[in-house]
């Protein structure tokens, strides 16, 4: 089965079947965050740095970095954001942009083996992104839509994913370095959105043997109490074979749900990570043997 290895200057992370589910922190993204966007545009990266540290401390094994700000110098801002993040945390980065010049600027600044986020199945996009992926020996997120749009049929999305994997091979990019995004749609608008993704992830795993990722919170868009849906959705994705996702690790219940998914699928063997994360420390004066004697006397 495929394993996708990403790295920072000092640390490797493996995305793959049988490995812990990889949480890619989503917070360094100015979309919908007016204060962050204004700060980044003005050259203030203090919030970027704080978000990087907080997400890694919360359990993120990778970070997504996006600098998509209207009327700003995205290539320069993305490169500087990456430099600032790499100065304070040691996890690998997903370099997130739809602007080819920004992707190249980010890749040139990055120390390690990055994940490029992303390409679609559109021929023009493939021909611009894949040469960069090869040039910088990166891996790439493959979004399973093309010129025809997003199909509700998992089989059509599978065809797009297969097309991307085949095009990547033409550039010398191995299947294990293509991480497919099956596209999570809002379940409030498409009642079968969850089942569509589960079916497609299983098919991608069994037939293409590629790793997968997604923007998991898309599933709850427009609904109340979104965290409840997100927290249920992620273990189901893990059970279907999803190997990573872009998430907000600052929600402890979501991190716990992901770790529970690893436990229940046998990846967290012996529940080692679960126990080390959630075992309550013994209270001062606690003595299990004394407690057992007390119970016997009672």
Q: Could you describe each region identified by the protein language model?
A:
Residues 1-179, 185-298:
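Domain-level signal for soluble alpha/beta catalytic cores
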